[in-house]
């Protein structure tokens, strides 16, 4: 079988390639160049200059062809520009979801099919056949599971996608990499947004959209002015740290008001929600279910999830949770699970 492997330069994707080579498949490595890194520092991100060289070195060790795909224009249009726009408008985007749906498993998958190949990545996730359909399932190692970022994959994508490390624990991945002699077997995990190579997300947004960033007031839910800030793009709903506010009780960001440049803060309870809407919903099965479905809902990657009900509504839906959850941030993904299976997900409104 011919397989195009998306090599990020990290140990996970390199090990995925090593496993496929060991199984005797015709493996081709490809890395994506997503931005101009001429002035970038080395960081713990993916897809940066050093990562491309690490991917090239891994491919050389495995003796497989290696190519670099320049996807800068597509990445800028589908990931970076929406990322900046969301922050300016008071939302908290998830660029990894957009990258997976609109670049990796769209653009790269099309290239794989043109080569008569499957597409493999180093994601910690599994694909199973269940009742005549493909199911996206949690990874064998719950601590490394990345299905939250993959809810946008539909049946056609899952048919041609492989996750070779999906059943492995991280320590086992490193062991396989070491045994294969991969030069990045002990490489640190990526922690940053790959295209934010200097400063943080707030600095990046301020640099890309300086005319849209405004200083403003930090106010209580009662309207009392408590402090000032240099832009709503530096905050997210549910945030506690970095507010710069003194007081006996902790305060959390309740909502962002980009129109008035106000950051509204309150108690943990005020920053919690048990009902919210989602838009741009994608269902793994294809069509939305005909009636409300019970699901465990994750509102961010590290969230354990809360039991709830999802009611489809056209291309969106309504979510009702059994208990209020702090930090249900507009712009973030809400992903719906039935046991270990991903049902779908959407953007929080």
Curated annotation (Swiss-Prot):
- Gene3D superfamilies linked: Adenine nucleotide alpha hydrolases-like domains (2.30.30.280), HUPs (3.40.50.620), Translation factors (2.40.30.10)
For this UniProt entry, the molecular function terms from Gene Ontology, in alphabetical order, are: ATP binding; tRNA binding; tRNA-uridine 2-sulfurtransferase activity
Which catalysed reactions does the entry list for this protein? S-sulfanyl-L-cysteinyl-[protein] + uridine(34) in tRNA + AH2 + ATP = 2-thiouridine(34) in tRNA + L-cysteinyl-[protein] + A + AMP + diphosphate + H(+)
- The answer to whether the entry has keyword DNA damage is no
* First-level EC class: transferase
The record's region (Interaction with tRNA) falls at 144-146
Q: Which NCBIfam families match?
A: PRK00143.1, trmU
Protein name from the UniProt record: tRNA-specific 2-thiouridylase MnmA
Encoding gene (name): mnmA
